[in-house]
Amino acid sequence: MGKEKSHINVVVIGHVDSGKSTTTGHLIYKCGGIDKRTIEKFEKEAAELGKGSFKYAWVLDKLKAERERGITIDIALWKFETPKYQVTVIDAPGHRDFIKNMITGTSQADCAILIIAGGVGEFEAGISKDGQTREHALLAFTLGVRQLIVAVNKMDSVKWDESRFQEIVKETSNFIKKVGYNPKTVPFVPISGWNGDNMIEATTNAPWYKGWEKETKAGVVKGKTLLEAIDAIEQPSRPTDKPLRLPLQDVYKIGGIGTVPVGRVETGVIKPGMVVTFAPAGVTTEVKSVEMHHEQLEQGVPGDNVGFNVKNVSVKEIRRGNVCGDAKNDPPKGCASFNATVIVLNHPGQISAGYSPVLDCHTAHIACRFDELLEKNDRRSGKKLEDHPKFLKSGDAALVKFVPSKPMCVEAFSEYPPLGRFAVRDMRQTVAVGVIKSVDKTEKAAKVTKAAQKAAKK
């Protein structure tokens, strides 16, 4: 095996019928983590049900069905490899909680793959005014996913017609430009997810197709297939050099060991012997040990899901939604209020000051009040349209002051991205998304454990 390949996360977006499942299924199937036995089992079932030609989507449907029934599928199934990367597919949308997942996301996507159906009439439906495609693309951009690949699918259904492909590239370029992407940095790849054309091997059906190209800081990059486009994603920098931020997913009490908080390192590193602070709880203590998958670690780095043992802290003092950080290096704090840019996605009425829905930010799930609507902005340029609007409706973007109903720890998106984006949930759906601009932090009278005092003297 040699050196481990770098990990990247991609999110696959597009209209319901664009062929996302088939395309993703195909990649996972051909380059991926599904073992042969499982594939053979699925193929046999598919054939028995007369769904043989459907096998890629069928593979994905099986995985989805198992996931929806609450059987957690080995996440390896959602992985595939390119020459350079190990790629994890973050939740394919269509899933009801997709937007929430993408924001509170267990992982931030490094790149979005937008699948567009090339079929006659289909393309137009996917990109129409109310299209999901627009919402997903806007969301990806708003949440800081800056790299995009466009795959024009179902090219077989238009007989690999060059003029159709060019027309779609032109329309889609305009569309993504409005969202905020620069089309020159985006590869446009014609594919057939169904037949597997131009996914992994270059297609022979389109003599006119010379390949895709995109501009990067390092110059122009070229390729032919979708796999090559994924392999050409620019390596994201992982924020190990920032101060530690680790939102807690759970806190366990383990006999003979004590209190063990669990969560994903978002920025910085966590090591045994470190003195950490939990916010907004205001508890400071020493980390005794750090482990992942039942193995002791010398340090946990961004992306690692770790459990760590802390001294002199009871399970009652810290909880899910708290954030752990280095007590000596920009420790996390609670907040009295924060200002955020909010985009209203779908709210049936009007939102005015006083509205108090639940915000999902990292692992915290807390009701927050829209305290003041400060200004209404143009969604694309961010330019101010009016001061102190009376209300907001679907499609509006605004700067809003929020006041949490309970102590909460959040950060500015510019400093700690994973702790600076949130979903606004109401009526069992995501009504808005937000990006935090500034935070009014509070100092809480802190509890410093004996272990922390001892460690500080060392």
From Swiss-Prot:
<feature type="site" description="Not modified">
    <location>
        <position position="372"/>
    </location>
</feature>
<dbReference type="GO" id="GO:0005525">
    <property type="term" value="F:GTP binding"/>
</dbReference>
<keyword id="KW-0963">Cytoplasm</keyword>
<dbReference type="Pfam" id="PF22594">
    <property type="entry name" value="GTP-eEF1A_C"/>
</dbReference>
<feature type="binding site">
    <location>
        <position position="153"/>
    </location>
    <ligand>
        <name>GTP</name>
    </ligand>
</feature>
<dbReference type="GO" id="GO:0005840">
    <property type="term" value="C:ribosome"/>
</dbReference>
<feature type="region of interest" description="G5">
    <location>
        <begin position="192"/>
        <end position="194"/>
    </location>
</feature>
<feature type="cross-link" description="Glycyl lysine isopeptide (Lys-Gly) (interchain with G-Cter in ubiquitin)">
    <location>
        <position position="437"/>
    </location>
</feature>
<protein>
    <recommendedName>
        <fullName>Elongation factor 1-alpha</fullName>
    </recommendedName>
</protein>
<dbReference type="GO" id="GO:0006409">
    <property type="term" value="P:tRNA export from nucleus"/>
</dbReference>
<feature type="modified residue" description="Phosphoserine">
    <location>
        <position position="414"/>
    </location>
</feature>
<feature type="modified residue" description="Phosphoserine">
    <location>
        <position position="289"/>
    </location>
</feature>
<feature type="binding site">
    <location>
        <position position="21"/>
    </location>
    <ligand>
        <name>GTP</name>
    </ligand>
</feature>
<feature type="domain" description="tr-type G">
    <location>
        <begin position="5"/>
        <end position="240"/>
    </location>
</feature>
<feature type="cross-link" description="Glycyl lysine isopeptide (Lys-Gly) (interchain with G-Cter in ubiquitin)">
    <location>
        <position position="224"/>
    </location>
</feature>
<feature type="binding site">
    <location>
        <position position="192"/>
    </location>
    <ligand>
        <name>GTP</name>
    </ligand>
</feature>
<comment type="function">
    <text>GTP-binding component of the eukaryotic elongation factor 1 complex (eEF1). In its active GTP-bound form, binds to and delivers aminoacyl-tRNA to the A-site of ribosomes during protein biosynthesis. In the presence of a correct codon-anticodon match between the aminoacyl-tRNA and the A-site codon of the ribosome-bound mRNA, the ribosome acts as a GTPase activator and the GTP is hydrolyzed. The inactive GDP-bound form leaves the ribosome and must be recycled by its guanine nucleotide exchange factor (GEF) (eEF1B subcomplex) before binding another molecule of aminoacyl-tRNA.</text>
</comment>
<feature type="cross-link" description="Glycyl lysine isopeptide (Lys-Gly) (interchain with G-Cter in ubiquitin)">
    <location>
        <position position="271"/>
    </location>
</feature>
<keyword id="KW-0206">Cytoskeleton</keyword>
<feature type="modified residue" description="N6-methyllysine; by EFM6">
    <location>
        <position position="390"/>
    </location>
</feature>
<keyword id="KW-0648">Protein biosynthesis</keyword>
<feature type="modified residue" description="N6,N6-dimethyllysine; by EFM7; alternate">
    <location>
        <position position="3"/>
    </location>
</feature>
<dbReference type="GO" id="GO:0019901">
    <property type="term" value="F:protein kinase binding"/>
</dbReference>
<feature type="modified residue" description="Lysine methyl ester">
    <location>
        <position position="458"/>
    </location>
</feature>
<feature type="modified residue" description="N6-methyllysine; by EFM4; alternate">
    <location>
        <position position="316"/>
    </location>
</feature>
<dbReference type="GO" id="GO:0006469">
    <property type="term" value="P:negative regulation of protein kinase activity"/>
</dbReference>
<dbReference type="GO" id="GO:0005739">
    <property type="term" value="C:mitochondrion"/>
</dbReference>
<keyword id="KW-0009">Actin-binding</keyword>
<feature type="site" description="Not modified">
    <location>
        <position position="298"/>
    </location>
</feature>
<dbReference type="InterPro" id="IPR054696">
    <property type="entry name" value="GTP-eEF1A_C"/>
</dbReference>
<feature type="region of interest" description="G4">
    <location>
        <begin position="153"/>
        <end position="156"/>
    </location>
</feature>
<dbReference type="InterPro" id="IPR009000">
    <property type="entry name" value="Transl_B-barrel_sf"/>
</dbReference>
<feature type="modified residue" description="N6-methyllysine; by EFM7; alternate">
    <location>
        <position position="3"/>
    </location>
</feature>
<dbReference type="InterPro" id="IPR000795">
    <property type="entry name" value="T_Tr_GTP-bd_dom"/>
</dbReference>
<feature type="region of interest" description="G3">
    <location>
        <begin position="91"/>
        <end position="94"/>
    </location>
</feature>
<feature type="modified residue" description="Phosphothreonine">
    <location>
        <position position="430"/>
    </location>
</feature>
<dbReference type="GO" id="GO:0019003">
    <property type="term" value="F:GDP binding"/>
</dbReference>
<dbReference type="GO" id="GO:0006414">
    <property type="term" value="P:translational elongation"/>
</dbReference>
<dbReference type="GO" id="GO:0005856">
    <property type="term" value="C:cytoskeleton"/>
</dbReference>
<dbReference type="InterPro" id="IPR004539">
    <property type="entry name" value="Transl_elong_EF1A_euk/arc"/>
</dbReference>
<feature type="modified residue" description="Phosphoserine">
    <location>
        <position position="163"/>
    </location>
</feature>
<feature type="binding site">
    <location>
        <position position="194"/>
    </location>
    <ligand>
        <name>GTP</name>
    </ligand>
</feature>
